[in-house]
């Protein structure tokens, strides 16, 4: 996890630490930082380490995990996600607000997009589940 952390935070940010306490117990934390973004970063780096170091064929992440992580770090993560294909592995990523990122990040996203969902006809299964009249039913 430290190697990945050093890639996404080259300015020497503390990396998460995994402590195996027993065969049924562990902790994963970043020393001196328990913010939401740091916790999400720790989970992402753990997932990437497992993806890169084991036979696990794929991981899936949602945009919520990236929402509290800096743009620079997110763009570095996108590159790490992309490099996983060199290992014949896949990353499934639900990503929104792509326009907020650099042209390079958007190019990387475009090259790797398999499915793009949006309103007005690009909904999964062709319909938006949240449209319709409100009901008083509970």
Q: What spans do the regions from the language model cover?
A:
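GG-anchored amphipathic helix commonly corresponding to the ABC/SMC/Rad50 NBD signature/C-loop
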Residues: 37-58
């Amino acid at each position: 996890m430290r190697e990945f952390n050093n890639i996404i935070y080259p300015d020497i940010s503390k990396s998460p630490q995994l402590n195996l306490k027993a065969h049924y117990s562990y902790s994963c934390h970043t020393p001196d930082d328990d913010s939401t973004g740091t916790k999400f970063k720790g989970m992402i780096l753990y997932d990437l380490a497992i993806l890169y170091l084991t036979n696990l064929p794929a991981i899936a992440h949602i945009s919520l995990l990236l929402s509290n992580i800096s743009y620079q770090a997110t763009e570095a993560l996108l590159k790490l996600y992309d490099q996983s294909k060199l290992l014949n592995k896949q990353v499934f990523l639900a990503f929104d607000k792509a326009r907020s990122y650099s042209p390079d990040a958007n190019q990387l996203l475009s090259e790797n997009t398999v499915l793009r969902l949006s309103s007005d006809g690009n909904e999964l299964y062709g319909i938006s589940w949240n449209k319709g009249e409100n009901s008083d039913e509970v």
